[in-house]
C-alpha cells in the first residue's frame, strides 16, 4: 500500500454530526444501513447485529437509491479483479508452470485488498487501518491519497503519478491532472 498516516481509534468511527447530517445519507436512520436495535438505550444493546460495512452487500443496502452504481459494481475491476488476471496471464505467457506461483502471490496479496463502495467513498481502505474520511460523509470523488494510492501507492500510484524513473506518468494525469476516479 501507500503511505497514509494511521488514524487514532476514535477518529476511525466518529460521525461528524454537523457535516454528516447535512448530507442526503445523513437523513437516513443509521439502522437502515447498519442494522442494530433502534429502541435500545445502552450502546452495547444498540449495536447488537451491527453491520459495520453495509456496502459489502451493495445491492441490498445501497441499491434502493444507487441502482445504477450497484449494478455496474458487479462488473467493476474492484469487484472482479479482472485486470489482475489479465496481468497474471500475460506475465506467465505460454509457461503454465509459472501460474501456481503467480496465483499464490495473488491470493496472498492482491486478492485480499479489493474492496466495497464504502471502503473507497466513506473510509480509508482496511490495509491502511481503515477509518472514516470525514465523519462518515460520502465522497463522490474519494481523496486520491487516502483512498486510491493508499492501496495502489507502492505499485500503481507511483506509476500513475510518473514517480518511477524513466517511466512517464499516466497520460490522464500528465496531460489533464486527472485524479484516478
Annotate the PLM regions.
Residues 1-181:
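Short sequence/structural segments immediately N-terminal
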Amino acid at each position: 500500500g501507500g503511505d497514509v498516516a494511521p488514524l487514532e481509534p476514535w477518529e476511525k468511527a466518529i460521525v461528524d454530526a454537523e457535516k454528516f447530517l447535512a448530507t442526503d445519507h445523513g437523513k437516513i436512520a443509521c439502522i437502515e444501513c447498519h442494522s442494530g436495535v433502534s429502541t435500545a438505550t445502552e450502546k452495547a444493546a444498540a449495536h447488537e447485529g451491527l453491520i459495520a460495512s453495509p456496502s459489502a452487500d451493495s445491492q441490498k443496502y445501497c441499491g434502493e437509491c444507487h441502482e445504477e452504481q450497484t449494478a455496474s459494481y458487479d462488473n467493476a475491476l474492484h469487484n472482479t479483479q479482472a485486470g489482475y488476471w489479465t496481468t497474471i496471464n500475460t506475465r506467465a505467457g505460454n509457461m503454465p508452470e509459472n501460474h501456481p506461483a503467480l496465483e499464490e502471490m495473488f491470493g496472498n496479496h492482491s486478492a485480499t485488498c479489493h474492496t466495497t463502495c464504502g471502503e473507497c467513498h466513506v473510509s480509508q481502505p482496511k490495509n491502511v487501518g481503515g477509518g472514516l474520511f470525514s465523519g462518515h460523509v460520502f465522497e463522490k470523488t474519494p481523496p486520491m491519497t487516502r483512498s486510491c494510492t493508499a492501496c495502489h501507492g507502492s505499485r500503481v500510484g507511483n506509476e500513475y503519478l510518473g514517480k518511477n524513473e524513466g517511466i512517464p506518468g499516466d497520460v490522464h494525469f500528465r496531460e489533464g491532472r486527472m485524479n484516478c476516479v
